Structure formats: C-alpha cells, structure tokens
From Swiss-Prot:
Protein name: N-acetylmuramic acid 6-phosphate etherase
Species, as recorded: Nostoc punctiforme (strain ATCC 29133 / PCC 73102)
Gene Ontology biological process terms in this record: amino sugar catabolic process; N-acetylmuramic acid catabolic process; peptidoglycan turnover
Keywords, ordered alphabetically: Carbohydrate metabolism, Lyase
GN (gene name): murQ
SUPFAM superfamilies given in the database record: SIS domain (SSF53697)
UniProt xrefs under InterPro entries: Etherase_MurQ, Glucokinase_regulatory_CS, MURQ/GCKR, SIS_dom, SIS_dom_sf
Coiled coil regions in record: none
Enzyme class: lyase
Record-annotated active site: E87, E118
Family designation: Belongs to the GCKR-like family. MurNAc-6-P etherase subfamily.
Amino acid sequence: MTNLQERGHLLTELVNPNSLNLDQLSSLELVELFNSEDQKAVAAVAAAKVQLAEAIDSTAERLRHGGRLFYIGAGTSGRLGVLDAAECPPTFCTPPELVQGIIAGGAGALVRSSEDLEDSIEDGEAAIAGRHITQLDVVVGITAGGTTPYVHGAIHAARQRGASTIFIACVPAEQVSIDADIDIRLLTGPEIIAGSTRLKAGTVTKLALNMLSTGVMVKLGKVYGNRMVDVAVTNQKLRDRALRILQDLTGLSREAAGFLLERSGKWVKLALLMHWTGLEKDDGDRLLSEHQSNLRAAVMSYQNHNQS
C-alpha cells in the first residue's frame, strides 16, 4: 500500500466544483444535484464491468468447490459488506457461513461509528486468521479511499493463505496500489460534501456488491430464469412469494401450490422439479444433488434420460 499521511490528492477527497454553493441551494436544487451526481455511480460500474464479471466467475468457481466469500471493510464500506452478506440467506437460502461480512470493530460498529479502528493492519490480519481463511475462499476488501490499513492487512493475510483476493476502491490505481487478484476501481469522482464517501462511493459500492453476490448466486443455480427458487420460506411474505412463483411457473391454483410446497419441504426448487417430472421428494432431492442443486440442469437431465 502507498504510505499516505496526506490524503488531499485522492479522488474521493477532492472538492466537487458542482457543489461549491451547496449551503445556498433550495431543497429542490439539492435533490436535483444529488440525482445528477448519482448518475456517475452507474457510469462507474459500467466502466468496471469487465473486472466485475471476472470477480463473479472467479468467486462462483471457488464457492462451487467448497469455498466461502468474505467482505471486509471499515465504516460505511464494512457496513455495506455486512448488509450484502446478511441478505444472502433469506434470498438464496444459503448457510450464514457461505457469505460473511467482516467490519472493523465488530457488530458494535454497525450502529455506532468506530472509524478509529480502521487504522490497524494487524487487526485486519487477525480478522482473516480468525475466520480460518484457506485457498478455497474469496476475500473482498472494500475501501472507498483505497487506503484503509485494516483492509490492506486483511488482503495481504488472505493472499498469504492462498485465498482469491478482490479489491474494491473508488480511487484510481495510480493513487493507491495493491497486490490483489482482481482490482476493481469504481471512479465516481469527488463527493457533494468533500470527503463524505458514504454518498456516491457508498452508492456505487452497493451497486457493485449487488452485482457480485447476485451474479455468483445465479452461477450457482440459485435462480430459475429470474425467479427466486431457493427463497427461504421463513415468514408470511416469503411464503406468499414462494406460492406465487409456483403458481406462475406451474399454472397451479394457490391451494394446489401450497400443497406442493408442503410436500417438497418448503423448497420451491424441489417443488418445481417434482411437479415437472412427477418425481417424489426423495428422488427429486437426489436428482438435484447430482446436479449441484441446479434446477435447469436437473430438468434437462431428466428429460434427456426419458427421451433416450
């Protein structure tokens, strides 16, 4: 990492010429300014599309072979990683340990600012050691300004353990360099409030993490078409969603879809396979296991076998 005591030259620290009169704007003008600046977040993701796609493919391959995905960061970056990780179990029915968020300062830093804890390289290294990271795992270091010692310590420790490393920052590589397998730069420019990286940098980070985790889960067969067929049916809202998916894809009545869902053990993916093939629960479960829980692959295998 570039040793930086003076950070004023970093892209995320520069003064935005478009917001010099911020304290004189009307509320409508302020909203319009934010809306205009936020377009740069979408453009920044588009500019990094090749690296993001590479990150999706690399991560999916590791997870397919038993690896785990870790996000690590401090402050806003750390909170966004924890948020994205926390959404994977209800959306894709993944075990909590498959995608994990690590934030400097631990759980307390989620609700109370603990930015002073980001300055320790050793703490970042210890966080990696504490998760028993191996060569199967993927570690994504997130730091808007690119300089967070906690994140750099974690990336260095992860590389030493043979893990795949991905770096996400909102400054160009010539300002802050790092040795990582995939280097993603999301360049949104100076913030509306100079240095407040919870704004555009936070927005673009959320967009990138949405793409990364969702893309990985798509590659792992967690969706069928654009349907959430691995949804965890843990409350009334998610049960309703599960029933609507079954109704839409099978043409069944809501009552029949509910019966099918119960027969499958509340697993939408298995319920669909049972309906389309006529298999019972255990046989359907076995067929899915043979195809790494990929519903489309399981259905095609069944059809090919029965046509031959």
